[in-house]
Amino acid sequence: MRAVVTGGAGFIGSTLVDCLVGRGDNVLVIDDLSSGSDENLTAGRASELGSVTLEVLDVAHENTTKVVASFRPDIVFHLAAQINVTHSVEDPINDARINVIGLLRVLEGARLGDAKKVVFTSSGAIYGEVDESQLPLAEHAQRKPLSPYGVTKLAGATYLDAYGAMHGLGGTTLALANVYGPRQDPHGEAGVIAIFAKRLLADRACAIFGSGEQTRDFVFVGDVASAFLKAGDRNHGGLFNIGTG
């Protein structure tokens, strides 16, 4: 199978790439390396099997459509995104440029390249504030994002559905909880487990702000990669929450 993975040099994307090449897929990674690293691609099975091509490119650049289409993928996994909620509030235009325009570049490439399916990475941020009585959260819960980031991730799922209706492009959206695991950036705002692990290894105390009673759903990156593979291999679409519960 021929697969495109945008954001494939990131910690989630590179884990997915390892799984894809492990089963024999030919993979094109599109990543601008602004937060990912090509070292993530040489650290796993990608370097062993030699079936990965890296295209260093901003996903929102107009060339993305041509690059995706010319690869003639069977499937596209779209993980490239601006993921910092604070940055989305400070610069919502750039957030939309990457998360909305970037998605449209990829969708057009998938359509023109006759891809069978796109798997889109969304987020629990599409639901906004959730009362604990609603947990574990079901996919039919009200979607009321409270940040530009959450808005773009909800818009992305809607665009994917529209491309299915207009062009017959298969699509599945995965709304991820807080992902943790190897290759995670210990400096990111969502990387609390990586941050704690780094501090513990350095024999330093871990700081918890607020009441200490906050709850978050964390999911291991390997389980997320498995969810992507299952979403790609199955015909049904729609939106699925991916978490531990």
Q: Which residue stretches match the model-derived regions?
A:
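Alpha-helical substrate-binding/gating segment
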Residues: 194-206, 216-241
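Glycine-rich Rossmann NAD(P)(H)-binding loop
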Residues: 6, 179-183, 208-218, 240-245
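A glycine/serine/threonine-rich, flexible loop-to-helix segment
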Residues: 133-135, 186-194
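A short local structural element in Rossmann-fold oxidoreductases
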Residues: 65, 184-185
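Residue-level signal for the nucleotide or nucleotide-sugar donor/cofactor binding architecture
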Residues: 90, 98-101, 140, 147, ...
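N-terminal Rossmann-like NAD(P)+-binding domain of SDR-like oxidoreductases, especially those catalyzing
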Residues: 1-179, 232
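Hydrophobic aliphatic residues
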Residues: 80, 110, 188, 200-201
